[in-house]
């Protein structure tokens, strides 16, 4: 008899069929067991879980007593209580490599569109307001040869540094727990303190995940140290930045502009002051949102779950210590 799994996000047909070759697949639209009796029943039998989003904590895990593996279609896993999963011997799988290049592309797009005011100016053209050459009050700022400061020199940070260094001749500063030899050799990147990065960067680019250590890492005190001409780009996690402090800094000119793909609350509330600011480019968490990358992420998550439930995991496990007991 095939193991039972719960799939709580739509995936391409061929990937669904691949899961069905190995498991009895119970498909649902999201995780709301209180409102879906069928989901509650499926969770009771499920050995595997695959999807994205949802809150997977102690209370949820009590609904799935037979769960052995969870596979998230994402690189981030802050919605999972990793300690609770580990205590129960449940392997948590994620997709850390397949979205790297696409997220770096998104960050470059935010840098360019924010610096050159692409969204504002495109909206003016569409509104029929382009009647003469624009004045200097609508000019943007250069990206090339400006200094980029990267918070977090992981895979995405490296891909962003590559684009900045080779594509735009940008000096690269970065912060990380330890120096990154490859970044320094390939891109001439300079490892520095957060204070130095804040003071020198023209573009402050955040690629960090959400942890207890990174929560509100960039707040009012840090924003006050940034150049008034600097632009903040966040495609890591929203809560890394104190959003209220950022709003104030954008309103009073403490910093020049911001390009944001992530927010403290998602979807972004319709009454958020960020939506009223001309110096903000806000997009709906699209970092990995291309057809190709989303397919590859789903395929990776499918393979991850198959590997976890068949005892063949070689990579992509957040808590590999649980595999020893399997």
UniProtKB/Swiss-Prot annotation:
Active-site residues, record numbering mapped to chain: 237, 266, 285
Q: Does the keyword Cytoplasm apply?
A: yes
> Where in or outside the cell is it found?
Cytoplasm
Q: Which reaction does it catalyse?
A: glycolate + NADP(+) = glyoxylate + NADPH + H(+); (R)-glycerate + NAD(+) = 3-hydroxypyruvate + NADH + H(+); (R)-glycerate + NADP(+) = 3-hydroxypyruvate + NADPH + H(+)
Query: Which InterPro entries would you find in this protein's record?
Result: D-isomer_2-hydroxyacid_DH, D-isomer_2_OHA_DH_cat_dom, D-isomer_DH_CS1, D-isomer_DH_NAD-bd, Glyo/OHPyrv_Rdtase_B, NAD(P)-bd_dom_sf
Gene Ontology CC terms: cytosol; plasma membrane
| GO MF term (any one) | hydroxypyruvate reductase (NADPH) activity
Work out whether the entry's keyword set contains Magnesium: no
Q: Which Enzyme Commission number(s) are on file for it?
A: 1.1.1.79, 1.1.1.81
Q: Which CDD domains match?
A: GDH
- What is the main EC category here? oxidoreductase
Going by the UniProt record, its keywords in alphabetical order are:
Cytoplasm, NAD, NADP, Oxidoreductase
Which family does the entry's similarity section mention?
Answer: Belongs to the D-isomer specific 2-hydroxyacid dehydrogenase family. GhrB subfamily.
Q: What does this protein do?
A: Catalyzes the NADPH-dependent reduction of glyoxylate and hydroxypyruvate into glycolate and glycerate, respectively.
Q: How does it assemble?
A: Homodimer.
Q: What is this protein called?
A: Glyoxylate/hydroxypyruvate reductase B
What is the protein's species of origin? Yersinia pseudotuberculosis serotype O:3 (strain YPIII)
